Amino acid sequence: MSSKCDVVVVGGGISGMAAAKLLHDSGLNVIVLEARDRVGGRTYTVRNQQVKYVDLGGSYVGPTQNRILRLSKELGLETYKVNEVERLIHYVKGKSYPFRGPLPPVRNPITFLDLNNLWRTVDDMGREIPSDAPWKAPLAEQWDQMTMKELLDKLCWTESSKQLATLFVNLCVTAETHEVSALWFLWYVKQCGGTTRIISTTNGGQERKFVGGSGQVTERIKDLLGDRVKLERPVVHIDQTGENVLVETLNHEVYEAKYVISAIPPVLGMKIHFSPPLPMMRNQLITRVPLGSVIKCIVYYKEPFWRHKDYCGSMIIEGEEAPIAYTLDDSKPDGSCAAIIGFILAHKARKLARLTKEERLKKLCDLYAKVLGSKEALNPVHYEEKNWCEEQYSAGCYTTYFPPGIMTQYGRVLRQPVGRIYFAGTETATHWSGYMEGAVEAGERAAREILHAMGKIPEDEIWQSEPESVDVPAKPITTTFLERHLPSVPGLLRLIGLTAIFSATALGYLAHKRGLLVRV
C-alpha cells in the first residue's frame, strides 16, 4: 500500500525544505523523506547546557544572500554580526601579525604586487564565466583541464603568495589545489561575489549568524509541514516506469507522487536505484563529483580573553604543522559562551581524523596559545567538533567540488530533469552555491519547475531574482586606483627591462653625439 501525494522531496536539508515549503504554500500535497533522524542536512545545531546552542554545520549568512535572509525572516529568525571589532591576526612562519580588513597586509613590495595581481586576475577570469553556465566561458575547456595548483603556479611568482592563495582555496572549498578544476573554482568564487566578498566577515559571506542557530530554518519549516516530513527514511529506489513515480525507502515504505525533487548532494544519487536507469551523462556525473573534507571545531573558554588583547578572534594561520587554517569568534551575541571556531581543512582533516578528540583539542589549544600569545588558550572549559567526512548522508562538507575536466563534460546535466525527477541542492545554484543561500535558490527553483510542469506558472517565472534584504544591505566591493593598475611581478620586470634598454639606448645616443664613443 503506498502513500499518495503530488510531490516527494528527497532530502530534508535547507534546499529540500525550502522546496517543500514553496510547494505547500502553493497548495500542493508534498512529502519530505529524510534519511537522518533530524532535518537540516549540512546544517546542524546542537543544544546543551555548556554551549546553549552551536552550529556544527553551515552557519554563516551575509549581504547579497537575500533568499536565505528573506526565508529566515519569514520564519521569525534574527541574525547577529560575527565579532570583528578588534584586530585580526595573520600567523606565518611562527610570528603573529595583527591587521584590520578582509586580507592581511603584505610588507614585501614584490609579494604585494604578486598578491594584488592574483586577486585581480581571479576576479577578472571569473567575470568571463557565466554564473548559470560555466561551461560556456570562452576559455572553458582550457581552464577546466587545469587544476588550481597549475593556475597558481602560473600566476604566483613568490612562495608567500602561493601559500596564501593555497590557503584561500582550502578555506573556500575544503579541497586541495591539485584536486579542483580551475574553471570550477573560478566560477565558484565569481558566483559568491568575488574574492573579497567570499572571504570577508564584514560585508561578506561570514558577516552574520542566526540567533539560536541555523538549524532552526529547517526545524521551523518542519513545524509548518507537520507529519508530511518523514525522518529516518533513506530513499533506495525511484521508479518512473508507471503513470506515477514510486519512491521506496529503506524500511520498505512506498510513496506515490506525480513528481520528485532530489535535494541531496549529487554523489548520494549512487545510493538510489533508478527505474528506468539514469541517462548516461547523469549516471556518470554522480560518480565524478566528491565533496570536500572538513572538521569544524569549537573551543570554549571562561571568557573571550583574546578581546582583552584587542584581537577579535579571527586568525589566518599558515603552515603545514598548523591543524587549523582559519578561525572566527563564536561567542554568543551577549558575550556568553566565549568560543573560537576553527576549521581543519582538506588533507589536514583526513590526516587529523586519525587522532582522538582529546588529541585534536590539545593541538588546537597549543596553536591558539602561540598565535594569540596567551596561555589562557591552554585552559578550555568545553569542546565541540563535527567531522563531516564520516557523515554517510552528506559524504563531506561544505559542498561538492568538480575535479579537472568534469564541468565542461558533465556540468550542463547538473540541473537537467530526468523524466519527472527535478534536482535541487546547493550544488545546483547559480548564486552562492555551496552556502545556505544557494540551497534556498535551488530548492525554490526546482519547486517552480514542477509548478510550471503542472501548468500553474509560466516558464519565465521559474527563475526569479530576489530583492535586496532591507535588514542586511550590501555595500559595494571597491578597489583603489593602485590595486586596479599596479603591474604584476612579470609586468614590473618587463617595465624594468624596457627602462634599462631605453636608458642604455639614450645614453649611447648622447655619447655618440658628443663624440665620446671611439671607433676601434
Swiss-Prot record:
Keywords: Acetylation, FAD, Flavoprotein, Membrane, Mitochondrion, Mitochondrion outer membrane, Oxidoreductase, Transmembrane, Transmembrane helix. The keyword Flavoprotein applies. Its main location: mitochondrion. It comes from Sus scrofa (Pig). It is a single-pass type IV membrane protein. It catalyses: a secondary aliphatic amine + O2 + H2O = a primary amine + an aldehyde + H2O2; (R)-adrenaline + O2 + H2O = (R)-3,4-dihydroxymandelaldehyde + methylamine + H2O2; a primary methyl amine + O2 + H2O = an aldehyde + H2O2 + NH4(+); benzylamine + O2 + H2O = benzaldehyde + H2O2 + NH4(+). This is Amine oxidase [flavin-containing] B. The keyword Endoplasmic reticulum does not apply. Its EC number is 1.4.3.21, 1.4.3.4. The modification N-acetylserine is found at S2. Monomer, homo- or heterodimer (containing two subunits of similar size). Each subunit contains a covalently bound flavin. Enzymatically active as monomer. InterPro entries: Amino_oxidase, FAD/NAD-bd_sf, Flavin_amine_oxidase, Flavin_MAO. It comes from the Eukaryota.
